[in-house]
Each structure stands twice: as structure tokens, then as C-alpha cells.
């Protein structure tokens, strides 16, 4: 496969590009990763055993659980800050997580506000403070503003901070204004755990419409409609046809993407990070094969010479791609069947089921998996390089963390 990136349209808020020369499993893996697998700095407030937020005082109309949920939805732009430690942070799939956690443990979000006025007070991210536990002081507010930046409309200079909670004013001398006092540690996570941790507000793709074929089909339809419709009715029906039926006429293996970040990462960076995460996951799968962790067993469900390759903690993102590459590489000369399925969404594993023309050993199956993984890594390296040509190839080196990750992955 030779992926091609074309039709790049990069604006201040949105990135559009065309990915062609690849199967839909590649495009879908890229989209799934951008939507759910890109890690970022977060406020973890659920489940209760992992909650990092603490409320000392809350007299607002919202109880603590609602405020915790609202807190977890606030994006944290630590990558935009000038804190020196965060310059080199690359929150990868496996690497650097321990380093990131150690840095995040230094900081504590604090909020302490009381409404002493006679009108409702809006408590926003502008009121947030960040305490450096090692230095025993608060980081400067201009730095906090970079981490929790306001929204500035294109046509105005007004700054709009994210509203967290409203504090009602005091009613009498005996009934004071509402107060909120809380703190929270920083953590890291991805939208796979909770949708509030997503780094994109738009991430979609569709088949590239074959404009010439679609126009020819429309002219045929207009000619057909002319016998029973007026000119105005034909024009209206043509517009209606373009909304749906036109999109069914598309170029094979060509997809138009639209990506819109919530602001933590640049739009192009989101695409390249998705490529890097997929490459890391493929390397990790390859490492599991070399470490003899990959489980291969005889399949009881179909013909002889059939085997099930069990992928732990990998879903359609990796499994469908791997199945596709194995299929086009080895069918029908070596294999007579190659399929993929995750039996239930809650399962921690999925299955690639293969059937061979002749009996084979596990080592042969592993080598075929490794060959397919190498081909997929090359595809995503090329996609990444097409978006940022000046960057060197993304390098992944196994670390001591990988063994710990494998131990976690390959447990029932």
C-alpha cells in the first residue's frame, strides 16, 4: 500500500485532507485513534476509588458529583505552557507515562471563591490557581492563563473563560453568599476511558465522491425526471439527490477527513500523534510476539488447519488492519480464510481466525503476523511523513515499561 495525502486545507480551526491508496481499515484506524486514544492531561474524578478532586466547602446549588463531572470536562493546555518540564513531554502510548505522572504529581489545582457581592458571581477557569508543591508557591497567573486559556472570538477582543459554577449572592446578613473551595491533582488519560477527555471536537471521514461519475449520473436522473416534473421540481430534486445519492458514487480507497481540535493540540499534530500511537501499538504487538506472549490456538469452529490468534487489549483499530493485510498477502496461495471479530464489546480480547491450505506451525503464523505488522508500520510512517515532511521517522524503542504493560495486557 502506498498512502497519499492530498487536498490539504488547513485553517485556524479545521484541517481537511484526503487519504488515498489505502483500505478503509487504515482510514478507520486513524479516525478511531484520533477520537479515543490520544492521551492528554486531565482531571480524574471517576470512579470514586480513583477520584483526585477534593471538596472542602460547597454551598452552591450543585452537589459535589456534578461539580466533579464539570471539572473533568475542562481541557488542560499544559502543552501550551512555558513550564520547562513540559517542553519535552510526549505523552505516548507506553513511553514517558511514568515521567509524565511524576511531573504532574508536583502540581495541585486550587479554587477558593466566595460571593460577597449582591449579584450572581460566575466562577470560571480564570479563578483557578495552580500550586507547585515542590516549590511551595503558586505558579504565576499568566502561566495559568496559558494552561486554561480563554476563548477569543475572531471578530472581537473579548476573552471568554469556561464557566465552572455560579455563586448566588447573600440574601441577608444571616444568609451569606455561596462559596466553593476545592482542589484537584492532575492526571492523564484519553477519551477511551471517558468522552470528556477527548482532544477533538470533530473527527470524521467519508468516501471521496467521484465527481465525474456523479455528474453523469445526475444528468441521467434529470433526463429521467424531465418527463414527469417541471424545471423547478427537477432543480429541487437534483439538490435533494446531491445530499445523499451522490455520496454513494465514490472513488475506491480514497477518503476525505475533517479534523477539528478542541485546542490542546494543533489539528495536524492530532493526525501525526494518532499515527505515532498506532505505530507504538504495532511495535508493542510485535514485541509481544517476540516475547512469546501472543496466544495462538487451534480453532474448533471451522475447517482443519484453522487457528485463532488472540489479541489482548486490541480491538478493531489494530485487529481489522492486521486481518486485512494478512488476507491480501497470503490469500489464496497460503490461506483459504482470514477473518476478524471481537465477540462482545466488553471482552478484553479479540480474535483473528485463519485457515490454511496445508498444516502450519505457530512459528509460521507468528512470522506472517510480524510481516503484516511491518507493512502496517510502513504505511503509517508514510502518512505521518506526508503531513510533516521535515520530521524524521518516528522511532520506537522498547523500555522496561513494556514488560509491565504486557503483563497487564495478557491477563484474563
What is the role of each PLM region?
Residues 1-412:
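Protein-protein interaction/assembly regions in multi-subunit complexes
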